[in-house]
UniProtKB/Swiss-Prot annotation:
Belongs to the heat shock protein 70 family. Induction: By stress conditions e.g. heat shock. GO terms for molecular function: ATP binding; ATP-dependent protein folding chaperone; unfolded protein binding. This is Chaperone protein dnaK3. NCBIfam families: PRK00290.1, PRK05183.1, PRK13410.1, prok_dnaK. Pfam families: HSP70 (PF00012). Residues 640-680 are annotated as: Disordered. It comes from the Bacteria.
Length: 680
């Protein structure tokens, strides 16, 4: 997918998910999901640091989570772009440690490295893994991307996602809402006009968007959601059910132990997935803890009915955003033409039943809920690169944007569900006589009081000429771009003085922090490349050892152990040296011995080939197959006589021991070719 305008390389589409992430690209005008290095089309959004400080991302990180809970980080998307004070108690209940720094931001503690990470840094590591795998697949470096976010992400969370992309070394060309991306994937080839409801229940977030799709136009009419509701919350219901039952029986709260909590979390996720296809599932956790009486185990059964009863509160929370989106779009459920389910959590039968009940329509099952968002992001990337034509995407802002006025009241400039990009302005004045400056406090949310909304930032306009209160005219303009990122301009219409700011959000990173994290990421990437190179070097060395041993073994079977004896001894010595260098992790010695063994093995194989060619010439000259046949016939006669003589002996008697075995150096193919002699 090359941009025709600037000759740039591929632009990829990335679904940066709470639980799993996916990367896709347009090839030949069609979106293709790129498998990772492990061969999977989805990559767990998990980062871990092993015992030697090595960084693990994806499935490798997830596998060791139970044994390394404090240094394994998942569901970080729930923390990105948020202040510590905004986090719920549930979101903070993870096996690793999250804390508040001096400025109120979220920090993730890594005991293994004795340092702390911002959520953006952890997300950047997942992005870098996706991009490196995509670069290997495409055969060229990937530098540009479209990244999706939940539709209900506020400005801070969007900016933080963009920062994560920058830390990963990406030029983030566009931030696009996940439901909108899903609608792009679903409606790309559909010409008839339809009203689509996208129900997006991911691992940690929930969005509902309503779009009108037809003739290449994708117009978002309304969006709603809950950024603290997702499939992980259903897992936690099972965790609590298991933990409370164990607490009642044994008096031990497993949630207080990090390793036990991780085991409960893994078992809960597994049970949730199984209950999508089964009516009940067994949960077995041996040695989950121990007391003075000995080890303790969990052995229980959870039915789908029990799980649904546990989930009633969460199902009720899913209802409100659907109702709100329908209300904002001025539509009834009967006016929805299609329902598209997005996110792995929508596989739960009770969620699908809820959608059927609320909309009165069967959800579409012809899209992959795990991949459809990344596919839509790849289509948006194709639009930006000029590879996809005649597509117009009209998205909306999910939350109202405004400023704080006298008394702490919010004055909305851009209402929620306004089509973006958009520019709106309003006139304000001073609240005191001879006021020389005003502070602009930008907020986002639906509450009447600014203190109850999300603070996005503050800046001051100074140099206002002295005048009675209410006389100066201060024009405040909001410019919201297609990425959902906001620029605010304040202008004194009398003096012409102007002050502008790109809202970074109160809980996102400063430019200095981003640059430092980018340097750290590049440094870590270099270390990762070095570790990978060492691993590949050892793998190549072991392959060479295996090849050398195989060649020696085959040569001995064909020509005997005396064949090229001096070269054989040299190869065996080099094999031992290389094995020792691998054990000692001596990179220089590995390189030297590898080269020497490779050269010695090449000479040995060349000599072996010459010997094989000589053997083939001998067989052609002396008609060896006929000779062998004659020898075998003669032996058959001798054996026949021996068998007739032995018929009179006891059949249980010990066999004669006088038969001579083949000499150690005799060629295997010089023995008679019949089954009778196989035991010798």
């Amino acid at each position: 997918m090359r941009s025709r305008s600037n000759g740039m390389g591929k632009i990829v589409g990335i679904d940066l998910g709470t639980t799993n992430s996916v990367i896709a690209v347009l090839e030949g005008g069609k979106p293709v999901v790129i498998a990772n290095a492990e061969g999977s089309r989805t990559t767990p959004s998990v980062v871990a640091f092993g015992k030697d400080g090595e960084r693990l991302v994806g499935q490798l990180a997830r596998r060791q989570a139970v044994l390394n809970p404090q240094n394994t980080f998942y569901a970080v998307k729930r923390f990105i772009g948020r202040e510590y004070s905004e986090l719920t108690a549930e979101s903070k209940r993870v096996p690793y440690t999250i804390r508040r720094d001096e400025s109120g931001k979220v920090r993730i503690k890594c005991p293994r490295l004795q340092r702390e990470f911002a959520p953006e840094e952890i997300s950047a590591m997942v992005l870098r893994k996706l991009v490196e795998d995509a670069s290997r697949y495409l055969g060229e470096p990937v530098t540009d991307a479209v990244i999706t976010v939940p539709a209900y992400f506020n400005d801070s969370q969007r900016q933080a996602t963009r920062d994560a992309g920058r830390i990963a070394g990406l030029n983030v060309r566009r931030i696009i809402n996940e439901p909108t991306a899903a609608a792009l994937a679903y409606g790309l080839d559909r010409q008839q006009e339809q009203t689509i409801l996208v129900f997006d229940l991911g691992g940690g977030t929930f969005d509902v968007s309503i779009l009108e799709v037809g003739d290449g136009v994708f117009e978002v009419k309304a969006t709603s959601g809950d950024t603290q509701l997702g499939g992980n919350d259903f897992d936690k219901l099972i965790v609590d059910w298991l933990a409370e039952d164990f607490l009642a029986k044994e008096g031990i709260d497993l949630r207080r132990d990090r390793q036990s909590l991780q085991r409960l979390t893994d078992a809960a996720e597994k049970a949730k997935i199984e209950l999508s296809g089964l009516l009940e599932t067994n949960i077995d956790l041996p040695f989950v803890t121990a007391t003075a009486e000995g080890p303790k185990h969990i052995e229980t059964t959870l039915s789908r009915r029990q799980f649904e009863d546990l989930s009633q509160g969460l199902l009720q929370r899913l209802r409100y955003p659907v109702e709100q989106a329908l209300m904002d779009a001025h539509l009834t459920p009967s006016q929805i033409d299609a329902v598209v389910l997005v996110g792995g959590a929508t596989r739960m039968p009770m969620v699908q039943d809820l959608v059927r009940q609320m909309i009165g329509r069967e959800p579409k099952q012809n899209v992959n809920p795990d991949e459809v968002v990344a596919v839509g992001a790849a289509i948006q990337a194709g639009i930006l690169a000029g590879d996809v034509k005649d597509i117009l995407l009209l998205d909306v802002t999910p939350l109202s944007l405004g400023v704080e006025t006298i008394g702490g009241v919010t004055k909305v400039l851009i209402p929620r569900n306004t089509t973006i990009p958009v520019r709106r302005s309003d006139i304000f004045s001073t609240s005191e006589n001879n006021q020389s400056q005003v502070e602009i406090h930008v907020v986002q949310g639906e509450r009447e009081l600014a203190a109850h909304n999300k603070s996005l930032g503050r800046f001051k306009l100074t140099g206002i000429p002295p005048a009675p209160r209410g006389v100066p005219q201060i024009q405040v303009s909001f410019d919201l771009d297609a990425n959902g990122l906001l620029q605010v301009v304040a202008l004194d219409r009398f003096s012409g003085r102007e002050q502008s700011v790109v809202i970074q959000g109160a809980s996102t990173l400063s430019e200095e922090e981003i640059q430092q994290m980018l340097l750290d990421a590049e440094s870590n990437a270099a270390g990762d490349r070095q570790r990978r190179a060492r691993i590949e070097k050892r793998n190549r060395s072991q392959d060479l050892i295996n090849r050398a041993e195989r060649q020696l073994r085959e040569a001995a079977q064909e020509f005997g152990y005396q064949f090229a004896a001096e070269q054989r001894r040299g190869i065996e010595a080099l094999v031992r040296q290389l094995q020792e260098a691998i054990r000692n992790e001596d990179d220089r010695q590995i390189d030297l011995t590898y080269a020497a063994l490779e050269e010695r093995l090449y000479d040995f194989i060349r000599q072996l080939r010459l010997r094989e060619e000589e053997a083939e010439d001998d067989e052609e000259v002396f008609k060896l197959p006929n000779l062998r046949e004659a020898v075998n016939k003669g032996l058959d006669v001798v054996r026949g006589r021996e068998r007739r003589r032995d018929d009179d002996e006891d059949e249980w008697a010990e066999p004669p021991r006088t038969r001579r075995s083949r000499s150690y150096s005799q060629r295997a193919d010089s023995a008679p070719w019949d089954d009778w002699d196989d035991d010798w």
